[in-house]
């Protein structure tokens, strides 16, 4: 039997406000345990929550960026459950009327054969809520500690429709969402610190069946790799269970990175188990049209708009445009290179950024802002490739690594001169070298004339070797073809 995977994601993005959502306490990460927990965060008697306007503005920004509806009136509700790191015994969230409704995010997904396809993921909602504290299970022998510094940190919970059909689609969506919230500046996106974490709702059903299967929710996935591994394992587990004649039970599960497996944590609750009701301590949130329009006017150029511009203005593919706009800084670097190198170098600039530059950044674990090669320096190198001063191969193998290492101040011209890397420009000298190569490789000449194309490549290789790689490969090809008739 063929199976179809159905996936929906719930993502918690910590909003980048200086203070918590209902108190003035700092949200700075890394403070000593329980030093950033006010009476409001601790749920002490006689205190009332006060909504952080900055958190609301960030929610509006996100809603506008995904083309969603901003609710003119939304309501905060109490989500009732008991857990040691939840001091009040309830979490302030939004239930019936969230601040953001609907919206879409378009993603580029890599298929099984390496091709890319586009897909639009529909969002159900995004709502404001407070984060819980943190349980410290490994800090005390035989006991669990509680750190309430995180309690009350503003969260935007972003919920999709069950639109994704593979782990690859889920990861592509999570990466696109991560890129967007960081681009907007509403979340720092630090997954190691828990600023951006995903819950995946996964089910399977026979291919062609309309009804959804029973879902299991994988909680707190804080890396894209774990998200992919968890979904892939869970899918295979569910299929095996059904094929063995067992029923899937709705449950909340955890992913163990050590074993690569999911394991049930508890029976999955439904909304009625949380006994939602409007929080009597908070007035309904009212957002008028003028507030929304002011926020709209302050939005930066969004990734989707920039991607469309890169395709139309620079002739890039949709995949290239998406890759180059992964972060605002990466996109800005690219545009700075093209501004210096000219529009004719738009595609080569994209190739260099996605190739050699990205490889160096990944190897050293640094962001584009910290790259030792400036946009102007890379533009100069592209110009030298374009005018034939150096070949693309020499630029990659010899010039760029020296620029990255800071040799000669990262100046491409100085490095080319110092290393003697300039391509041969004397046609007469090159013709003489090719004549010598043909004379010394009579057998290859005969094989080529007998129809063996590989022999021609061998002659090109000998010519490049004789010039120590300084000849222009295109010119070598042209002269060889001319002389071989």
Swiss-Prot record:
* UniProt cross-references to PANTHER family, sorted A to Z: GLUTAMYL-TRNA GLN AMIDOTRANSFERASE SUBUNIT B MITOCHONDRIAL AND PROKARYOTIC PET112-RELATED, GLUTAMYL-TRNA(GLN) AMIDOTRANSFERASE SUBUNIT B, MITOCHONDRIAL
Coiled-coil positions: none
**Which PROSITE patterns does this chain map to?**
GATB
Secretion signal span: none
Q: Which GO terms describe its biological process?
A: glutaminyl-tRNAGln biosynthesis via transamidation; translation
Report keywords, A-Z.
ATP-binding, Ligase, Nucleotide-binding, Protein biosynthesis
Task: Enumerate the InterPro entries for this protein.
Answer: Asn/Gln-tRNA_amidoTrfase_suB/E, Asn/Gln-tRNA_Trfase_suB/E_cat, Asn/Gln_amidotransferase, Asn/Gln_tRNA_amidoTrase-B-like, GatB, GatB_C_1, GatB_Yqey_C_2, Gln-tRNA_amidoTrfase_suB_CS
> What does the protein in this record do?
Allows the formation of correctly charged Asn-tRNA(Asn) or Gln-tRNA(Gln) through the transamidation of misacylated Asp-tRNA(Asn) or Glu-tRNA(Gln) in organisms which lack either or both of asparaginyl-tRNA or glutaminyl-tRNA synthetases. The reaction takes place in the presence of glutamine and ATP through an activated phospho-Asp-tRNA(Asn) or phospho-Glu-tRNA(Gln).
**Entry's Gene3D superfamilies?**
1.10.10.410, GatB domain, N-terminal subdomain
- Pfam families registered for this protein in UniProt: GatB_N, GatB_Yqey
Q: Indicate the family of this protein.
A: Belongs to the GatB/GatE family. GatB subfamily.
What taxonomic classification does the UniProt entry list for its organism?
Bacteria, Pseudomonadati, Pseudomonadota, Betaproteobacteria, Burkholderiales
Write down the chemical reaction(s) this protein catalyses: L-glutamyl-tRNA(Gln) + L-glutamine + ATP + H2O = L-glutaminyl-tRNA(Gln) + L-glutamate + ADP + phosphate + H(+); L-aspartyl-tRNA(Asn) + L-glutamine + ATP + H2O = L-asparaginyl-tRNA(Asn) + L-glutamate + ADP + phosphate + 2 H(+)
Q: What quaternary structure, including any partners, is listed in this protein's UniProt entry?
A: Heterotrimer of A, B and C subunits.
Please state what class of enzyme this protein is.
ligase
Q: What is this protein called?
A: Aspartyl/glutamyl-tRNA(Asn/Gln) amidotransferase subunit B
């Amino acid at each position: 039997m063929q199976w179809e995977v159905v996936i929906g994601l719930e993502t918690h993005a910590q909003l980048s406000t200086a203070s918590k959502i209902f108190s003035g306490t700092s949200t700075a990460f890394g403070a000593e345990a329980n030093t950033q927990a006010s009476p409001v965060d601790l749920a002490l008697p006689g205190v009332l929550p006060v909504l952080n306007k900055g958190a609301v503005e960030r929610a509006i920004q996100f809603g506008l960026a995904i083309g969603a509806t901003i609710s003119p009136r939304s309501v905060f509700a109490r989500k009732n459950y008991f857990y040691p790191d939840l001091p009040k015994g309830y979490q302030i969230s939004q239930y019936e009327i969230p601040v953001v409704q609907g919206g879409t995010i378009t993603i580029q997904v890599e298929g099984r054969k390496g091709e890319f396809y586009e897909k639009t993921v529909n969002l159900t909602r995004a709502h404001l809520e407070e984060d819980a504290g943190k349980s410290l299970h490994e800090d005390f022998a035989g006991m669990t500690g509680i750190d309430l510094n995180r309690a009350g940190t503003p969260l935007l919970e972003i919920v999709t429709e069950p639109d994704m059909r593979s782990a690859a689609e889920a990861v592509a969506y999570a990466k696109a969402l991560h890129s967007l919230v960081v681009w907007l500046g509403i979340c720092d996106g630090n997954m190691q610190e828990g600023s951006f974490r995903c819950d995946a709702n996964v089910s399977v059903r026979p291919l062609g069946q309309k009804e959804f299967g029973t879902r299991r929710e994988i909680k707190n996935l804080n890396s894209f790799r774990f998200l992919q591994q968890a979904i892939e394992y869970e899918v295979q587990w569910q299929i095996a269970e059904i094929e063995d004649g067992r029923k899937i039970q709705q449950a909340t599960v955890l992913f163990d990175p050590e074993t690569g497996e999911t394991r049930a944590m508890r029976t999955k609750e439904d909304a009625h188990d949380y006994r939602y009701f409007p929080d009597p301590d908070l007035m309904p949130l009212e957002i008028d049209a003028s507030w929304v329009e002011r926020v709209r006017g302050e939005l930066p150029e969004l990734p989707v708009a920039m991607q469309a511009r890169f395709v139309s203005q620079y002739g890039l593919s949709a995949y290239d445009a998406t890759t180059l706009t992964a972060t605002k800084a990466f996109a800005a670097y690219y545009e700075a290179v093209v501004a210096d190198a000219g529009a004719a170098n738009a595609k080569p600039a994209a190739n260099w950024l996605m190739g050699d530059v990205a490889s160096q950044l990944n190897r050293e674990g640094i962001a584009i802002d910290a790259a030792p090669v400036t946009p102007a320096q890379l533009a100069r190198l592209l110009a030298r490739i374009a005018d034939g001063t150096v070949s693309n191969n020499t630029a990659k193998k010899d010039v760029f690594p020296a620029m990255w290492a800071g040799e000669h101040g990262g100046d491409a011209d100085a490095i080319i001169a110092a290393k003697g890397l300039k391509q041969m420009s004397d046609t007469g000298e090159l013709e003489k070298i090719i004549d010598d190569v043909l004379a010394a490789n009579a057998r290859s000449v005969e094989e080529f004339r007998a129809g063996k194309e590989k022999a021609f490549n061998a002659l090109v290789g000998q010519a490049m070797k004789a010039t120590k790689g300084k000849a222009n490969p295109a010119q070598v090809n042209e002269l060889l073809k001319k002389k071989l008739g």
